[in-house]
């Protein structure tokens, strides 16, 4: 069957669910699509369809970020269901880097947990501009005072990570209960109404993002597929600019640079002639083998961005109370650095100055020189996260690039 063309009639936003493992992110995503499928053309996605990777089903947790589409009366959303499990924060960073806004899911029975904090920190670091909160599983909490305490704790946590706790929309409900009643076609039930309130808050509380469509095209590659007889497809979010059929583009990163031609563009299995900043797309490339491309490379307008392996940065090292290191580190320290969809090991050098420190302590704000194992596409002002041993230990911004 021939694929349909993607018609852009509504504002497109990238949204996502973030939060601690088992707090109900995937169930909420399933409930949203099920509800919207009853009132418009959205395709319902079950929990098992969203949690679709075989390893995920076996463990009952989301590992890769799942991309789902749905429509409200006002907007078209690409929804990214992000992993909450600590082992898979790396994939969450990729998902969060693509979001215009996020739904932070917090279980009312637990309140904020370690990954709740880490997801908020990473959301801030990769530039997620707006957050709304779904306080889930309230059917399991009988004490209203306890609910109020959890809400207060969530608002305080939002303030810590520079999201305005006082003005953030917090919607209380139960994703599982809503899903049960939607499946019974009882859309006037109170649990379904709570879910409807959340969907309305999405439309109202997440502002329409300003897209950089006039800047040179840039897409950070998230995944790569081979299509027999057609070639290689790369997927990811367009960070800025536009791309159209037959455009010439550079693939660069990890010490490689190749030039190729765009021979197809798709979004949610529908064909596009042109795609622009904010779109989550698959791009078919001429004459490129799957093994030549890897996640973390970028597609870009030729010569609009260059690769570097060394840069200076302003960095904040998390304190132990923020989930960071407990001990200081010294020159030569080698953590992982995360940019868009890339993660690369790098070596830290303390910048020479009159009071050059011997060591850097958790909680310090410092300027560092970083040498990466590979050259990757970098720019001034680009933000990154620093991780070691399965946890985020710092966050930074590039202030200078070194040839």
Curated annotation (Swiss-Prot):
Boundaries of every tr-type G domain copy: 10-210
The UniProt entry, under InterPro entries, shows: EF-Tu_GTP-bd, EF-Tu_GTPase, EFTu-like_2, EFTU_2, G_TR_CS, P-loop_NTPase, Small_GTP-bd, T_Tr_GTP-bd_dom
The record describes the protein's role as: GTP hydrolase that promotes the GTP-dependent binding of aminoacyl-tRNA to the A-site of ribosomes during protein biosynthesis.
Chain positions covered by the region annotation G4:
136-139
Q: Which biological process terms from the Gene Ontology are attached to this UniProt entry?
A: mitochondrial translational elongation
For region G2, the annotated ranges are 60-64
Q: Which organism is it from?
A: Eimeria tenella
Gene3D superfamilies under this entry? P-loop containing nucleotide triphosphate hydrolases, Translation factors
The entry's family comment says:
Belongs to the TRAFAC class translation factor GTPase superfamily. Classic translation factor GTPase family. EF-Tu/EF-1A subfamily.
Q: What is the protein's name according to its record?
A: Elongation factor Tu, apicoplast
Q: Which PROSITE patterns match?
A: G_TR_1 (PS00301), G_TR_2 (PS51722)
Q: Name one GO molecular function term.
A: GTP binding
Sorted alphabetically, which Pfam families does this protein's record hold? GTP_EFTU (PF00009), GTP_EFTU_D2 (PF03144), GTP_EFTU_D3 (PF03143)
Do the record's keywords include Plastid? yes
According to the record, the residues making up region (G3) are 81-84
Query: Which residues are noted in the entry as Mg(2+)-binding?
Result: 26
Q: Where is this region: G5?
A: 174-176
Keywords assigned = Apicoplast, Elongation factor, GTP-binding, Hydrolase, Magnesium, Metal-binding, Nucleotide-binding, Plastid, Protein biosynthesis
Q: Which reaction does it catalyse?
A: GTP + H2O = GDP + phosphate + H(+)
Q: Does the keyword Lipid biosynthesis apply?
A: no
